[in-house]
C-alpha cells in the first residue's frame, strides 16, 4: 500500500481526505450491479431494488418473500420449510465441533455478563406535596435479529444481537438468516442461537427478510424492532421500514482506523488492518501515524500478509478501494483526523493509549494497546460489536441493552401538589391558546 503524506495538508484538505460516503451513496460493484440488472431484467439502483422488494412483500406477504428468495438466493422456500425445525437444530449440534461449542459458550458468557452491567432500572422519586415522578423501563415485545450470510457465516452476530435482547427480557426474539445454496443455515449459527435460547429462526435474507419482519406475513409474524448488520440492500430496507418498526441503526461496510506512534509493531498493525479488509470489498481499513518508519513498514508488511490469506481477493479489493496509510505531522493531528473519521472500530496503538483516549470524541468502539486487537471485540471480550459506521459514530451509539428497551415517564400528583402547580399550568396552557388544557386543571382545583 502507498503512504499518503498529509504532513503539509491544510485543515480543509485533511477534512476532504477523511470524508466518507454515506451508506446510501455507496455504489454497487460492477459484478453485483450486473447480477442485479440480470435478475430484474433492467438497470436498477440498490434503492430501487429495495423499494420494489419491500413494497411487494408488504402487499403480497409470503408469495413475494418466497419469490425473491428463489430469485436472489436460488433457494425454494415454502411455509413448511422456512422456519428452522428441531431436527435441523439437532443436526447442527451433531456437526459443530466440541471445541467450537465450548468457545461459543465462553464467549456468550462474556457477552451476557457485560450487558448485564448495562441494565437500566425503573425508578420513582418523591416530590413536594406527596407527588411521585419516575421512569418505567420495559423491554420491547418482540425483536427481529438479522444475521448476515453471504461470503461468511457469523455466529458472533447472533451473540451480539441476541445476548443484549435476552438480558433486556424481550419475550419474543426472532432471527432471520439467509439460507445457503442447500437451503440450510450454517450449523455454527444455529448452535449459537440455541445456546442463547433463540429458537424462532427463519431462513430468509436480504430486503425481503426485513420487509417480512416489519410487516409480517402469513408465516412470519411481525416484530416491533429490527437489529443487526447487513449489506447495502439490508440497510436500505431497514431505512424503508422505519416508522412501521424501530431499528437499531443504519450501518454500512465495516471499518477500522488505527492510531499509531513510533512504538507500534508494524506486523500487528498490518494484521489488524487486514482483519477488517477481509470482511467485504467495500470495507475500509485506515492507519494514521506520525511515524514515517511505521507507515512505510506497514505498507510493506500488508503485502506479505495479504498474499497468505484465503480471502486475499476480497481483502485486496477493499484495500485498493478504501484502504489508506496516512502520515500526519504530529499526534494531535492524528487524533483530530480520527475524530473526523468517526470510525466503527478505533485501535489506539501508542506508547500511552490511555493518554490518547480522553481526546477521542467519535468512535463506535475503542481498542487500547497492542494486546487489544479488534477481533477480540468481534468475538469474545463482551462489549457489543454492532457499531455505527460511515461516520455515524458522531451521533449513534453501540448496540446495547437499552436498544431493546423502552422508557415510559411516570407522573402521580396528589390534590395538594396539583393545586400548588395549577396557576402555572393554566397560564402556560392559555399562552398556547389551548383552553381545554387549562379547563382540565380548573375542573379539578376549582379555579
State where each predicted segment sits.
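N-terminal Rossmann-like NAD(P)+-binding subdomain of aldehyde/semialdehyde dehydrogenases
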Residues: 1-141
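Conserved small-residue-rich beta-alpha loop and adjacent elements
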Residues: 125-191
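Conserved NAD(P)+-binding/catalytic subdomain of aldehyde/semialdehyde dehydrogenases
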Residues: 195-268, 272-275, 279-284
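A conserved active-site cap/scaffold subdomain adjacent to cofactor or substrate pockets
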Residues: 249-321, 325
